[in-house]
Amino acid sequence: MTMRASLAIENFLEMMSAERGAAQNTLESYRRDLEAAAEELAAKGVNLAEAETGHIRMTLDTMAAQGFAPTSQARRLSALRQFFRFLYSEGFRQDDPTGILDAPKKQKPLPKIMSVENVGRLLDRAALEANEAAEPGERIKALRLHALLETLYATGLRVSELVGLPVTVARTDHRFLLVRGKGSKDRMVPLSRKARDALQKFLTLRDSLPGSDDNPWLFPAFSESGHLARQVFARELKGLAARAGLAASSVSPHVLRHAFASHLLQNGADLRTVQQLLGHADISTTQIYTHVLEERLHKLVSEHHPLAD
């Protein structure tokens, strides 16, 4: 039995209100999405209540072409799913045309990126505190934090990879770290001179502590067994950021990992190399940084093209 789109929408909204107790805002949102889809399809001679999968996909494609966010497209599809399930359950349709449609993928937010200047301020503050700490307990923690930061910014390690480094990696070739990442995949990452120096200063003091010979971790937790917890590192990092005059809320181990990748790309590294250094199994994961490449290419053309504005 065929039903006009407008009547079908009213019946659906009445059911949502009476049987499911949907809030007024929810009902209005459903109405807007369903009426917009009905109007678009009517202009093409299609009754929304009789629409097929291709028609529904077309309305979503139109939204995308008009610049609607994936969240708006997903909301529209959700309303249509509820609508067609209602028609199916009431016997007005023999199928649900939305059943095989996937929700539009949400765009990954661009990572927060610290400027080179702010990373420098953070590292300088860590170095200052490592040099000035006099009390033994404070000195070892300050040296550890400085070594952690220099290593993180030099390598872009995941925080779990960083705090879980075995001490043996610092006793072999000091120019590289052998890192075991996700899926137990190993990769070699180079160390900067500053990172090697900070690690060596920390390691010298670490090795002088009682029981250090039996501790397998490069960055041990001094108050308990095991390695430094990533939550403790994140907390110490935020405290350091505040002392360096930076907004603590904008600084985290993950933000520094993003800074490592972005600063490499800004200075000429290619995406494939950055993928290998970050330990991404798929290049698509690294492509969140393509905006950095686009900015670099735009700048390159602007500076070197003879007819650029």
UniProtKB/Swiss-Prot annotation:
Gene Ontology molecular functions: DNA binding; tyrosine-based site-specific recombinase activity
Span of domain Core-binding (CB): 3-88
InterPro entries linked to this entry: CB, DNA_brk_join_enz, Integrase-like_cat_sf, Integrase_catalytic, Integrase_recombinase_N, Integrase_SAM-like_N, Recomb_XerD, Tyrosine_recombinase_XerC/XerD
Main location: cytoplasm
Keyword Cytoplasm carried by entry: yes
Cellular compartments per GO CC: cytoplasm
Subcellular location: Cytoplasm
Positions of the Tyr recombinase domain: 109-302
Xref: Gene3D superfamilies: 1.10.150.130, Intergrase catalytic core (1.10.443.10)
Similarity comment: Belongs to the 'phage' integrase family. XerD subfamily.
Assembly description: Forms a cyclic heterotetrameric complex composed of two molecules of XerC and two molecules of XerD.
Function: Site-specific tyrosine recombinase, which acts by catalyzing the cutting and rejoining of the recombining DNA molecules. The XerC-XerD complex is essential to convert dimers of the bacterial chromosome into monomers to permit their segregation at cell division. It also contributes to the segregational stability of plasmids.
Protein name in the entry: Tyrosine recombinase XerD
Organism: Brucella suis biovar 1 (strain 1330)
